[in-house]
Structures are given as structure tokens and as C-alpha cells.
Amino acid sequence: MGVLKFKHIFFRSFVKSSGVSQIVFTFLLIPCCLTLNFRAPPIIPNVPFLWAWNAPSEFCLGKFNEPLDMSLFTLMGSPRINVTGQGVTIFYVDRLGYYPYIDLTTGVTVHGGIPQKVSLQDHLDKSKQDILFYMPVDNLGMAVIDWEEWRPTWARNWKPKDVYKNRSIELVQQQNVQLSLPQATDKAKQEFEKAGKDFMLETIKLGRSLRPNHLWGYYLFPDCYNHHYRKPGYNGSCFDVEIKRNDDLSWLWNESTALYPSIYLNTQQSVVVATLYVRNRVREAIRVSKIPDAKNPLPVFVYARLVFTDQVLKFLSREELVSTLGETVALGASGIVIWGSLSITRSMKSCLLLDTYMETILNPYIINVTLAAKMCSQVLCQEQGVCIRKDWNSSDYLHLNPDNFDIRLEKGGKFTVHGKPTVEDLEEFSEKFYCSCYTNLSCKEKADVKDTDAVDVCIADGVCIDASLKPPVETEGSPPIFYNTSSSTVSTTMFIVNILFLIISSVASL
């Protein structure tokens, strides 16, 4: 894509002026055209797409002796309050410092109710104790702060969260009786947003300083607020005002070391609606990941559920997994966190249902989409980037061709993959996806996948594709070509110099 853009720019410039200065100027444009789109590198080597598990699955083994196959998940953690030292640690309102909120069911005020009324220092002192308790060792892992009671952006506290606006206005009126309601509202907005910002910012700074090897971020940040799917003509897009509000949260993105958006579904969303809903939420998160530094974006780990929010015992179908997990992979996120509550592991029956679902639907699909993504990365990017849709709003997915592959569950309970890709399979990847380089890597995009000799990718022990492809018939004078999407390598320079030499020679002969 970048090479084609450069080609058009170059030849338009050359036709207008045959001067050397024009050619040199165009030459200098090359790096900016070839390095526009980066992705965060894998946090674990050779794991370009990370699967994490954040559900209390230990109940199935501990209480009911029903082990679940977790071999495909790299990081794991239970959301239960008494579990520590995990790969995924989630901090709810009662587990990290003194989070102020108002219980909307009972009306009870906790820790002052609003951020203006809590002692920030007392909160940070307690937070330090909590972080050291839940993370006794600073291993690589996820640190997810799940504070959903109020939002740091004043305008986003709509009903029923407008109680935080009302309390803030009341506080200002008590302290400044001479102010009119509009004046008190303006002052309340300023004080609330400043206190909320300081509260969230200092908390994540503390976490990063104490446990720097963990990936710190807030659950549901960023959010797209594209929940208007009952309206006619729904296309999933985020409202412009919400995109602007996400831009205004740059102070939060600058201190986060990962983003944790959510793509939970309910039964009111059809497969088509769910696809549009998820697609735009993930796309917005990836956009936000580049706000701190476009050349060094934050990793995006998307929270997903296996069940619906309004029917917690009804599992997503395979089509709905494509709409959620498949969308996330095709758009170039760093990974997915599967979250679950006690409802899916609270009884022997629910554990058996979960085990069956994982064996027959979830794990085969994870194997399918992850191997396809890894194969595409190996073929197109030489494993130095990820494959991303050329048309973000298309329904192109990274899937194995069912005509050429068979994923089987063997008698011992392990999965195996049988089959190998064809050149046509690889060409389809090349037609519909492009290579987005990892940060700070020299990333080559293969121009002709017919030159691929073999594919060798694995995602777990024995879950691999290891296949030799028939070598292409080479004609004299047409060696394999690579497009270099980094401006720092010798091969790129030589490629461009050769083009310039040929053009100048042609002009000189006229």
C-alpha cells in the first residue's frame, strides 16, 4: 500500500519537473510514505496474538474435578478477591485504595462518593498496600483497573451516573452560596474533572512504579459508546463527539501501558449488528493506541465474554465468535482477554457445559484464527509485523481454508491440525491483508507469495502447521522481490536508487 502511494506521488512529480531537485525531493518523501502504520510488538516472543483467561475456572477443577483445557491461553487470572500473584490481575472498586463512589442501588456513599471529597494521599497509601498484596512478584502480566462507577469526562456521566454531577454541584453550592446555578455547574465540572483526572492518573503512575513489568490500563478505556444499535441505519460508527472526548483523555493514554476495551454482546444484537458494533469499538481502540506515539503504539487487549450479558448461561455461537474474536484479530489488536463470572463455573453442570463448549467451538476457533494470523504474518511480514485488513470495514477474516485444513480433537484430549495451505490460500491473504510492522523493526512485505517455500507455525505443543509448498517455476531475470516498509535498510535504498537510475537514464536518452 505504502509503495503504491509512493509510486503515484513520484511519477506525478516527475512528469511536472525533470529537474534533479524534484527527484531528490521525491526521494526524501519515501520514509514518510512507508512507515505510517505500526503495531505494538508482542509482549511475549513468538506470540503475536495473545490469549488471556480472566475467569474463575479453578472452581471446575477444585470443586467438581472437571479440568478445562487452558493450553491455548498464555496468561491466566481469576477475578476472585482472595487470589494473588496471577498473570491477569483485575482491580475492582473494593481492591485498590479508597475509590469514591455512590451505590446506585442503595444510595450509600462510599469514601466520600465523589473524587473531590477523598484524600488522594490516603488513597495512594492504601493502593500501595493492595498492589503489593495482589502482585507479590513483578512478573510479566496484565494489571487491569476496573472502575466503572463514574467517568472522568463530565459529559459522559449521563443517567443514572448524573448523580455524580448533582453531588458535585451541591458541593460547590455549599462552599459558594453566592454562585448562580450555571456558575456552580461550571465550577463543579472543573473541580470534578480535575479531581477525577488526578485520582486515576496518580493511581496508574503508582502501579507502574511499583510493578513496571505489568501492563497497566483501565478496563473499558477507550470506549466508543456506539450502543445505539436499535436505531435504523445503524453502522456501528462512533460519534464524532466521543472520538473528540477520547482525544481529550490523552493524559490517560500517555500513562497507560496497555488499553483494555470491551466487546461484550447481548442477545438483542444480531450477528450483523454485533459485527459492526465490535468492528468500530476495536478500530477506535487501535486509533487511540497511537495517540501517545504513532510510531510506538500501545498494545490493545480486548475484553470479550463467551456468554451474553443478558443471558449469562447462553454461549456465543461460532458465527458470533467470528463477529467478536475474528474481528479483533483481523483488525490487528494485540490480544483478547476472555472474562467470565462465577455463573459459568458455579456448578458441575455449568462446568461440563463450559468444557463441552471449549472442546467443540471455542478452542477449535482459537486454533483456526490464531494459526491463520500467524501464517499470514510469517508469509507476508517474515514474522516482523501483523496482517491487517486492507479494507477495515470488510468481512475479510484470517481463517484457515476449510477445504485444506482439519482441526481434530484426539483421544488424549489434545488438538491436532491436519492439512497444508495452497498458494491460492496465501494469495488470498495477500489480496485482502497487508503487513503492519512492529515498532522499531525492519519489516519486509513479500510481493509475491508464490515464492513461499514452506510454512512452519505453532501456537501450542503439537498444534502446528508445518508444510512444504511446491517451489514456484522461476523464469530467468525475475528473482523474488520484497518491498521494504522500513526506511532504514540498505535493500530499500538500493531498490529506490535503481528506479531513479532507470528513470534518469530514460530521460537522458530522449
UniProtKB/Swiss-Prot annotation:
Covalent S-S links between cysteines: C60-C351, C224-C238, C376-C387, C381-C435, C437-C464
Keywords: Cell adhesion, Cell membrane, Disulfide bond, Glycoprotein, Glycosidase, GPI-anchor, Hydrolase, Lipoprotein, Membrane, Signal
Glycosylated sites: N82, N166, N235, N254, N368, N393, N440, N484
Compartments in which it is found: Cell membrane
Enzyme Commission number(s) from the entry: 3.2.1.35
EC category: hydrolase
GO cellular component terms, semicolon-separated: inner acrosomal membrane; plasma membrane; side of membrane
Propeptide: 492-510
GO biological process: carbohydrate metabolic process; cell adhesion; fusion of sperm to egg plasma membrane involved in single fertilization; hyaluronan catabolic process; penetration of zona pellucida
InterPro entries: Aldolase_TIM (IPR013785), Glycoside_hydrolase_SF (IPR017853), Hyaluronidase (IPR018155), Hyaluronidase_PH20/Hyal5 (IPR001439)
Pfam families for the chain: Glyco_hydro_56
Extent of the signal sequence: 1-35
Designated name of the protein: Hyaluronidase PH-20
Source species of the chain: Macaca fascicularis (Crab-eating macaque)
Source taxonomy: Eukaryota, Metazoa, Chordata, Craniata, Vertebrata
